[in-house]
Amino acid sequence: MEPVIGKLNDVIWIVDLNRQSLDRVIPGVRANDWKNMFYANGWNVIDAKYGTQLETAFSSNNGDLLKTWIDEMPNQRYQYLLRLDQNNLRSEVPQGFKHSKELSNFLNDYSDTQLYKMFRNLGGHDFDKLRDAFNQSVKSSSPSVIFAYTFKGWNLPTLGLPRNHSTLLNPEQMEKLSQKLNIPKEDIWAKLPESSAAGKHCLQKGKIFSKTTKLNSKHIDQINIPTELSRPLPKFDISTQDYLQMILTEILRSNPELAERIVTTSPDVATSTSLAGWIANKNGLLWDDQEENNINNNMDLNQFHNEYDDPLQWTSSPKGKHIELGISENNLFMLLGQLGLSFERHNEILFPIGTIYDCFIRRGLDALFYGAYSNSQFIFVGTPSGITLSGEGGAHQSILSSSIGIELPGISMYEPCFAKELEWILLDSLNKIKLRTGST
């Protein structure tokens, strides 16, 4: 739960909550624990547990019995009832319930077909309930999470099967499903009729998402990225790690158009991965909370840094160019993946640079994979690397990074030995991001 997310009002997460794992029916679902976690972090929590049919039944006289029965029912029992047809469901309903007689009397007002449909009416499959949930989330001033309760295999003959994760429909079942969905047998890939409301909507959205975004020359022409820096190399021995900081500060000094669009991020290791100079040179942290910014920027904190000869003062503002994350490499690569698609999403070029201890790249591998898969354009620097951390033991050794860089498609991997080499690599990578022609 990164603190910065709690300040966003245009974030909607959907938790697809059903009673099955991949292998079995889950004995207990800790939904309330998950909801409380979001509550504690200031999120707007929306429950889409029951559909409108069930909620209408709950609100009628003695409808609370139906709700109590469903809420208290073990998952295994619930899954069993899902497999019953509408002719056999009613006789099984009251069993094991302390108010079975009263519940049976209540359900007598519903036909077998009505009871069958109502029992399956969960919020995650009820469009009216979902529309209401989305409307609530749009009006919220904080990020929202929707818990949508669903069935695995909805509207399929495999609904409720304990092992339906790897189950495929047979040809006969596929044919019945096609008939149910009015899909013509001679054209199984037929689109929705373009004259229908749904067809028009899909056509409009398809044009938006399939169009090729053109480079905005107004922004691009102003950014000149040289092949090397005009500043000479230092006359003393210097590590590539330290020279990274010099490259960034030189770009800040000599190329303000480029520096304006560079955004850096790190999972709580900015100082030890050589971003201190970049942050301290008037860039600061990106933070859009004026009250907290006033606290961060007060004189007492600055005096503390001065007293301990700390060049890095963590000033923050809505114009900051560094995003400081918690210790989560997965969050780092998720953020870089989104920043690296800023042009494709918003027609604005950004140059994202993330720094990370090289040995911990593997911790965020899944998010890195999807960033590269999405053709996101960003730079990440594994530093310190190699045997630099030998004193910290085997768990801090970069034994997989080279393999990841070589084997993962969509990634260009470099291992610079010299400071000048690092300069060439970094500038060339920035230019590829500008032209959208390179890899991650």
Label each region the model flagged.
Residues 103-124, 128-132, 139, 193-440:
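Thiamine diphosphate
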Residues 3-25, 159, 349-350:
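Long, low-complexity, intrinsically disordered polar/charged segments
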Residues 14, 147, 266:
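Generic enzyme active-site microenvironment
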